[in-house]
Amino acid sequence: MFDTHTVEIEWAGRPLKLETGKIARQADGAVLATYGETVVLATVVSAKAPKPGQDFFPLTVNYQEKTYAAGKIPGGYFKREGRPSENETLVSRLIDRPIRPLFPEGYKNDTQVVVTVIQHDLENNPDILSMVATSAALTLSGVPFMGPVGGARVGYINGEYVLNPHLDEMDESSLDLVVAGTYDAVLMVESEAKELPEDVMLGAVMFGHKGFQPVLDAIIKLAEVAAKEPRDFQPEDYSALESEMLGLAEAELREAYKITQKADRYAAVDAVKAKVKAHFLPEEGEAKYTAEEVGAIFKHLQAKIVRWNILDTKSRIDGRDLETVRPIVSEVGLLPRTHGSALFTRGETQAIVVATLGTGEDEQYVDSLTGMYKERFLLHYNFPPYSVGETGRMGSPGRREIGHGKLAWRAIRPMLPSAEQFPYTLRVVSEITESNGSSSMATVCGTSLALMDAGVPLAKPVAGIAMGLILEGDRFAVLSDILGDEDHLGDMDFKVAGTADGITSLQMDIKIAGITEEIMKVALSQAQGGRTHILGEMAKAITESRGQLGEFAPRIEVMNIPVDKIREVIGSGGKVIREIVEKTGAKINIEDDGTVKIASSSGKEIEAARKWIHSIVAEPEIGQIYEGTVVKTADFGAFVNFFGARDGLVHISQLASERVAKTQDVVKEGDKVWVKLLGFDERGKVRLSMKVVDQATGQEIANEKKKEEAAE
């Protein structure tokens, strides 16, 4: 019934198995991939023909994690998986980026990749396995695809590169880098690092590229026995249209791209486009080409002319040379009632970034396959349509916004203080108010400024820069701080963020083969110069974190209590801690290890809560004098509440220096009194004395002390 084919190899010390022919047989391509004991199913379906009027390649990648893969049941009311999590969105992008450039130009059939994690061994991250399984499924499917693609994760532990480290090894690694590519080219890099130099980062890329070569061999081996017949796809030949259009519009387009102001440049390009449309799409008579074909070739021509201009003149669209960064203006304290704020403007790209400090209650609970954990640093990136002068949909963030926010998050996180050093939850929101390229890197810069303005003790300021690279034969140009118009026409787009001493995040997307290690080295070196320049411009606004928090930020004091006392502080059903919160006004968060965080904007409220908790967990000291309240009287003495919730007995003989006939003659319930802790009886009961303490001053009476010492 099943025509199954399997290939198995040893990869980085674990078995990798690729199997096809048994599951999801109606998909164009389906591969069940196993690494260690993590299992994913990747499927590919591509329509047999494009939709009429389709003018782009509609590729969709859906990565989904099923909770049953880790032996869990989903939370929530409905107890089933819902909308994609942030991690699922990020892995979907990770799979998409290296495969998208490998579909032939002109292929416009609806194509969907669905990757499902169906088993997780809690050791091997399914993201790399998903990339491999997707590549294998595409290679087998018969869909036109110039693969296969391999992928690998690279760690850097104790000065050594590690291929596909286990999940628990990542805690020791100063690098988390994912690289994907073909036999002879790197196509995609995504990474987070702890201030590593450029040569170490580039070395990791090449190490990963070499590391996934056996995977490519395995995919080819599987395809040799299981691949479907390739679909017959011949891209349309538009060389005649391009040649004619070039003759008609080249001179005017070159002039249009000499205009440095974005709006004026767009107007000039639109005028040329209108002329081209009028020529090739006349209102009267039958047009030789469709509007989609004319539009696509015009777009292609725009890219060619900009590339030629840059390579020929070493001058760019806005008049800059290759290495110059656009003018930068940095401001902090823009919104004085917020906890920290910054306005970062670089040319026509601008971000308002606001930092908010919260308590442990504000931490985000993340329910992942590997278990529940709490995230104390959140970074949200918003890209409204007005930022590019357009109208558009507003609502929940899209994949691009989530991806850009995570890139900035990775860049900043290595410089954040530890929870012990700075026990706040941090949320940063970046509002992109203008965009003409590199808005994610503007977010990195703005976040660094806003956090320093908020008084968050960042180890060092962080800056980011977006770079481009154009390669034609043996000529190439590296562009620093690319514009939006330059973003899509390059052969390599990469974003580098870091401090003056090293890289904290690197993202690369390489679209063609032929970009050598040497070219990447030049590009990273130029990016380092740009990053250093940007850090200098940021320093004009603020050079280091403020010494104190903003006026409106909450204060947090941390204290530690014995674990066995947690129950006493919380009380039955939370009664005690609720009373402390209600009466002091402070927020209180208690961890399982006995760490107590007390938060309030008022120092008095924090101190009141701290004293209250201390009185519950601390033990009274023998010989110390305490103020107390009489809570009950009896014939043999009075019970005094003197240390938090602790009561003790003042025996009738200890009420006063003279003989006392009746307890009520000396004290009544509710009286405030001073008592000295004499000790504990054989049953552990507290023994208190009033007669050795001056009830007016709370000071010990000297002669009574001598009598007491003599009696002892």
UniProtKB/Swiss-Prot annotation:
User: Cellular component per GO?
Assistant: cytosol
Residues making up the signal peptide according to the UniProt record: none
Which SMART domains does this chain map to? Answer: KH (SM00322), S1 (SM00316)
Q: Name one GO biological process term.
A: RNA processing
Q: Give the UniProt keywords, A-Z.
A: Cytoplasm, Magnesium, Metal-binding, Nucleotidyltransferase, RNA-binding, Transferase
**What molecular function terms (GO) are annotated for this protein?**
3'-5'-RNA exonuclease activity; magnesium ion binding; polyribonucleotide nucleotidyltransferase activity; RNA binding
Major localization listed first in the record, in broad terms: cytoplasm
Q: Which domain of life is it from?
A: Bacteria
Residues in domain KH?
554-613
Judged by the first EC level, this protein's enzyme class is transferase
Residue numbers binding Mg(2+): 487, 493
Q: Which cofactor does it need?
A: Mg(2+)
The UniProt catalytic activity note for this protein reads: RNA(n+1) + phosphate = RNA(n) + a ribonucleoside 5'-diphosphate
Query: Pfam families, from UniProt?
Result: KH_1, PNPase, RNase_PH, RNase_PH_C, S1
EC number per UniProt? 2.7.7.8
Q: Where is it located?
A: Cytoplasm
- Using the record's annotation, list all stretches that form the S1 motif domain: 623-691
Cite the InterPro entries for this sequence: ExoRNase_PH_dom1, ExoRNase_PH_dom2, ExoRNase_PH_dom2_sf, KH_dom, KH_dom_type_1, KH_dom_type_1_sf, NA-bd_OB-fold, PNPase
Output the NCBIfam families linked to this UniProt entry: polynuc_phos (TIGR03591), PRK11824.1 (NF008805)
Cite the HAMAP family for this sequence: PNPase
Tell me which PANTHER family the record gives.
Answer: POLYRIBONUCLEOTIDE NUCLEOTIDYLTRANSFERASE, POLYRIBONUCLEOTIDE NUCLEOTIDYLTRANSFERASE 1, MITOCHONDRIAL
The entry assigns this protein to a family as follows:
Belongs to the polyribonucleotide nucleotidyltransferase family.
Q: What does this protein do?
A: Involved in mRNA degradation. Catalyzes the phosphorolysis of single-stranded polyribonucleotides processively in the 3'- to 5'-direction.
Name under which the protein is recorded? Polyribonucleotide nucleotidyltransferase
